[in-house]
């Protein structure tokens, strides 16, 4: 993406997230969408991440070892006119777990505008 899309200082950061074991029926992290552009996530071999399917069912995300999970954020959804949709997700921590996340979004002072998508994406 061109610099004007994300500003001079895009808001990007990495976070190591620790989830303690939660009681049955409770979420370690409640259902939410990431607000930024996109998130790259490593689960480190312990499951618990779930994504909400269009039919309302929660799906366990069980990637192969070393795989990177890509979550679409609300800013990418807005910029593509809902072509890409933010992934509603949560964490059910049946055992202690760690994940590493890279969050990417625009400079907080940047005005966002819809992207001009090719007609084939309409």
Residue ranges, per PLM feature:
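C-terminal flanking tails of non-heme Fe-dependent oxygenases
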Residues: 1-122
């Amino acid at each position: 993406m061109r610099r004007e899309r994300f500003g001079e200082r895009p808001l990007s950061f990495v976070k190591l997230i620790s989830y303690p074991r939660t009681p049955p029926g409770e979420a370690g992290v409640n259902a939410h969408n990431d607000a930024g552009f996109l998130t790259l996530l490593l689960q480190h071999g312990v499951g618990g991440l779930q994504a909400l399917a269009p039919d309302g069912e929660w799906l366990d995300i069980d990637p192969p070892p070393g795989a990177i999970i890509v979550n679409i954020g609300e800013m990418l959804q807005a910029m593509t006119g809902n072509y890409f949709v933010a992934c509603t997700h949560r964490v059910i921590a049946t055992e202690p777990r760690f994940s590493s996340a890279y969050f990417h979004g625009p400079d907080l002072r940047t005005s966002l505008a819809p992207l001009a998508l090719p007609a084939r994406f309409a």
